Every structure is written in C-alpha cells, then in structure tokens.
UniProtKB/Swiss-Prot annotation:
It comes from Xenopus tropicalis (Western clawed frog). Its main location: membrane. This is Vang-like protein 2. Residues 1-81 are annotated as: Disordered. Has a role in non-canonical Wnt/planar cell polarity (PCP) signaling; can recruit dvl/dsh and prickle from the cytoplasm to the plasma membrane. Acts in a PCP complex to regulate the polarized assembly of fibronectrin on the surface of the mesoderm during gastrulation. Regulates convergent extension in both dorsal mesoderm and neural tissue without affecting cell fate. Regulates neural fold closure during neurulation. May be required for cell surface localization of fzd3 and fzd6 in the inner ear. Residues 57-67 have a biased composition (Basic and acidic residues). The gene is vangl2. Residues 69-81 have a biased composition (Low complexity). Interacts with dvl/dsh. Interacts with prickle3. The chain crosses the membrane at residues 109-129, 148-168, 179-199, 219-239. GO terms for biological process: convergent extension involved in gastrulation; establishment of planar polarity; negative regulation of canonical Wnt signaling pathway; nervous system development; neural tube closure; Wnt signaling pathway. Residues 15-33 have a biased composition (Basic residues). Residues 1-108, 169-178, 240-521 are cytoplasmic. The keyword Cell membrane applies.
Amino acid sequence: MDNDSQYSGYSYKSGHSRSSRKHRDRRERHRSKSREGSRGDKSVTIQAPGEPLLDNESTRGEDRDDNWGETTTVVTGTSEHSISHDDITRITKDMEDSAKLDCSRHLGVVIGGALALLSFLTPIAFMLLPQILWREDLEQCGTACEGLFISVAFKLLILLLGSWALFFRRPKAFFPRVFVFRALLMVLVFLLVVSYWLFYGVRILESRDKNYQGIVQYAVSLVDALLFVHYLAVVLLELRQLQPQFTVKVVRSTDGASRFYNIGHLSIQRVAVWILENYYHDFPVYNPALLNLPKSILSKKMSGFKVYSLGEENTTNNSTGQSRAVIAAAARRRDNSHNEYYYEEAEHERRVRKRKARLVVAVEEAFTHIKRLQDEDQKNPREIMDPREAAQAIFASMARAMQKYLRTTKQQPYHTMESILHHLEFCITHDMTPKAFLERYLGPGPTIQYHKDRWLAKQWTLVSEEPVTNGLKDGVVFVLKRQDFSLVVSTKKIPFFKLSEEFVDPKSHKFVMRLQSETSV
C-alpha cells in the first residue's frame, strides 16, 4: 500500500495472500504509469481488535486485500459528521414547520369531527325537540310512525360505520394544501344541515306543528340525504382514482434508479404521497458509497503543457504555431481512464464473487451445525437452547465472512451486528434455510427493509410549477426533495386506443403442399 501504516501483532500472512499479491502486482504494472505521482500521503492507524465486529466506520474495503481486516479495524482521521450554522438554521426551520403541520392537522380533525357529530345528532334532535317542548299537543304516533323510528336507527348506524371507515382513518401524510374534494364535501354537509335546521326552525318550531309523523319523516329525509352525500364521497375520494389515466416515471436523481406507475385522477400532492408509499418498497435502498468511481480514476491528473517564447519578437508567430501543434497533439492523445475503470470493475466483481462464495459456504456450514445441535437436544433435554442462544452460537463461524462481504459490497452501514443476529434468530425460529437467511444480504433490498434510522425522512419537500391542488395533466413534472437526493416525477397521459375487428373464416385455413423433385416427404 502507498499509505504509511502500522500493523498490529494480530496480522499475519498466508499463501493465499501471496498469490493475491502476485495477481495484484501484475495489475499494478499495467497501470503504474497512470498512477505514479497522483497519490497523496495518507496516514492510517491499525488498532488491535476490541472494536465491534461490524464497524460502520471501516468502509474502505476496496483498498484491502483478501485477508485485510480479519483481526484489525481501520480508523482514519477524516470526520464524517459536521454541523454548521446553516444546518442549525435548517433544523430550526424544520421544527417550526412540523409544529405548524401538527396544528393544521389537529384543526382539520376537530372541524371534521364537529361537523360529523352535528350531522349525526341533528336527525335525533329533530325527533326529540317536539317531545320535549310541546309533548301534550302532539298527535299520537301510529304504527307507520313507529316503523320510521326503526328506519332512522338503522340508517344512522350505517351512516356512522360508513363515515368511520371512510373519513376517520389515520392520515398517511401531511398535505401542504387542503384536499379539495374533502373540503367540498364538508361544505356540502354543512350547507345541508344548516338548510334543514333553518326550515325546521321556521316551519316546525315556530308553528309548533302537531303532526309528529310528518316531523319524523322530515328527519328520515335528512338521514337519506346524508347517506347520498356519503355515497358521493365514496365516488369522489375512492372510486374516481381507480381507473388508470396517466403513467408516471419516477427517477432518483443520484443513481438514476427509476420505476413506472399507472395512476388515476389525483391531485399533485396526493400523487406525491402515493409515490412515496411505493418508493419505500419498490426502490432499492439509497447507498451513496456506490456512486463514487474508483480512486485511481478520480485522482488521475490530466497532463498539461506550458509553452514559453524565449526568442526575439520576430519569432512570436513560429512559437505560437509550435504551441498550437503541441496542444493539438496532446488533445489527440487517447485518455486511458476507461481502461482503468474497466480493470477496477473487473477486480471488484472478482472480489465480490469470491467473498460471496465464502459467505455462502460459511452460512451453509453454520446452519448445518445448528440443525445437528437440534437433533442432539432432543436426546439431551438439559442442553436445549432458545433461538437467541442458537443464533449467538453459530454467528461467530460466519461473522468474518459476513463482515468482509458487506465491506466489499459497501452494505456495511446498513447492517449492524445486532440486526444480523436478530435476523438470524428469526430464521432459526421459523426453520428457514440458509438461502432465505442470505436473501437480505446478497443484494440491496427495498428501503423499508432496513432500520428506519437509515432511511427515515421526517419531511419531504414538494417542488412543482403547478399548484399542488390541481389534478395531473400530460407533461406535468414535479420533484420530491430531501436532504441527500430527490425524486423527479414526469407524467404522460395513457394514449387512447382504437381497435378494429377483422373476421377470419375458420374454413379459409386450407393449404396446398407444393412438391418438387428435391422435396422429401
């Protein structure tokens, strides 16, 4: 290595490392010219074992050989966490915005709950007020009137259950603007209830109407109107969006990961929330370590030329021509960076395949061991282990292979030792195979699979040129931003298809074999 390192007493050399060193020397001779003079002096301290097995700080797997890090931990002098005045200002702003969102959320819930309670109690009040105010003057309620009581009771129960299922659900997100259809429905219910109360106050309370059956029928009509409003709410809020009308493409700005979705008529803010719901289980987890090119490519310096004129003034034209020729020749030189990138990628793939094979073999052997222990436990009940103890017993045999594989694939920040133990315990408890255990680690999984501290974004920012309460249209583009990356969403309308019918008579499928002298039958 080019770095000045101090090796601990736990490091050792093996025959495999010598063969690996020969392979690495051949590769270094091929690219020695491009790498000379481009490396800076770095100081790396190798500490004795004593740190956690899966250290999140040691992610420099690309610069190590196959036996590096078996008993050591690399600690660099570079700080990965810093905070500035701008960060503090942004955090304060986020806290203020979250407080405003909480207030608006509670205000909307209070208004909706009050309106629902008013509309539910109004029919009951219509029937109770005459009994309380002028009970002696009311006409007797016959059989038909008593049957209306049953109708009102069941309709109110249906309305209560339907409203609870449709409106009183836990919100999935805080919207930056009011949900237009929900607000229109609330206004419609408010106007309906107020209109019924005005008519009830003028025509029934003031005149003290004695026809109690007519009053009950009036209350039944209000319940029927509320049921129709609830049906309208189901159509506008749930059924309208089911028919696909648009195709949206979601692209992550950093690594280019993309997905396509079909979606119906929704406002831009509701589409944004729907996309975020699908993002966490459709997109692979964002890993910024995979975005960097190899250091040999990034540190390569382009050669430059400086041309000085040392002659007289009359030689200025000649020197200018020579300098142009030199610069043109330098520009025609082919850059070998793609060769460097090719060899780096090939070496990385080779290392990943080798360490993957080691990990698979280690896990297979560990699971075979735990199955053998389970068979022995049936004979010796005194030595029975619970899943946690069994996971801890076999984890040591696969820990080194797991650590080196996660370092090579740059997945180490997303898998702690405790999370691996918990997953191993889960697999043992449910009698899962080694392949089922390795499924989480052999490739990047969806974002929701990892611990929320790794991916949780408290707030996303919706950036759109169109008002977010408008519905989707063809060509609409908006962005969902967070601190480290953003999701760019573009919209295309699903085209209209015109199909024509062409009838084919089954009797027309007749063929004739053409025989020639060379034809073999």
